[in-house]
Amino acid sequence: MYWRRIRQTAVLALVVGAVGAGPAQALTLVPPKPDVLFGVSDQGTTQQFNEFTELLAKHPALLETFHPWGNSLNQAYERWRETGTRPVLAISTMDDQNLSELITPEQIALGAGDDYLLQLNDFFAKRGLPAYVRPLGEPNRCLNAWSAINCDGTQKGGEHTAYWYKEAFRRIAAIVRGGQTLEGLNATLAEIGLPPLNRTKGPNPTELEAAPVSIVWSPLPGGSPRVKGNFPGNFWPGARWVDWAGTDFYSEYPVWKDLKRFYVGKQWKGKPLAITEWAVSGKDEPRFVKQLVAWTVKHPRVRMFVYYAGFGPGTNTYDLRLYPRTTNTLRLKLRRETFLQYAEYNAGLFPPLPPPPPKTAKAK
């Protein structure tokens, strides 16, 4: 079993001591330089994870699970535990069966989804489980329910604007991180113009434990569609609410200038970067793999690299087994030791060592 008791105890000790009146200290969970956390998306079974691992001869450090709003984490937790991976929880507001919208950005911002956010905080805090939480990824992709732009380029308006997306993101970060008394949390929410905690299933907790989570903000590097108001910066919630900046990059849309522009974005220039989804689809693309791995290695702020493996047999165009040359190339590239197979529990949790004392001038 990969869970390491000593490290988990250290995390729990940090979390227990973090509850107070102020907001929880952000945890980046960044690996030591120059390491990159290699990951794969969750296909729903441990067997599929193991098959992916065998295919590439590389154990992924991360397992990214896509969940609709309100979903229980019990089954996902078992997969994370059995595979020895650190979780990446990607949260959607669309039903995964019929794609209907479960909750709007405005409703989240105003507290209609607080029961679920409290559930997430409690889940990760009680277990002392380090995780990356990726709420409402790709807000500038028109097909997502939480986007602000229609596919014809017009504004959705109403409950679906960039303003409400940013407010929803801030509320998610504040509650899921925890580490505050109820009074402190409500003060934080009021500071950004949002109503107090709104638990409907029982009374509000007197305090929220600090959860060892890192919040990932992840738009597309260029808008879909590419129109005014639909670029990454339009959806930036602010550095206070973001621990990682991430983006997705697929062989079907290899717009390298957008990826380069995202990397140098001024608003998130101080954040570690994640490739939260990447994949090959439609045809064998070994050249794309070589380019993307080389780009990742050459850009030191990129510290996470997650392959999107798709869902379902037969119609899954992201299945690497369809692309033997791509698979062979990726297998070779992942031999680099800097692509981590396991996530260390204490990575990014503890403050850096203090700087050495300044040198004093020698007496003459």
Language model region names:
Residues 1-26:
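Secretory targeting and sorting signals
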Residues 27-44, 131, 272-360:
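Substrate-binding cleft of secreted/luminal carbohydrate-active enzymes
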Residues 28-115, 280, 306:
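N-terminal substrate-binding region of glycoside hydrolase catalytic domains
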Residues 37-40, 60-66, 86-91, 131-135, ...:
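Structural recognition of the beta-strand scaffold that forms the well-ordered cores
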Residues 72-92, 237-285:
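Glycoside hydrolase catalytic-domain groove-lining segments
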Residues 75-197, 210-212, 305-308, 317-337, ...:
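Substrate-binding cleft of extracellular glycoside hydrolase catalytic domains
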Residues 191-211, 215-248:
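Substrate-binding cleft/loops of secretory-pathway carbohydrate-active enzymes
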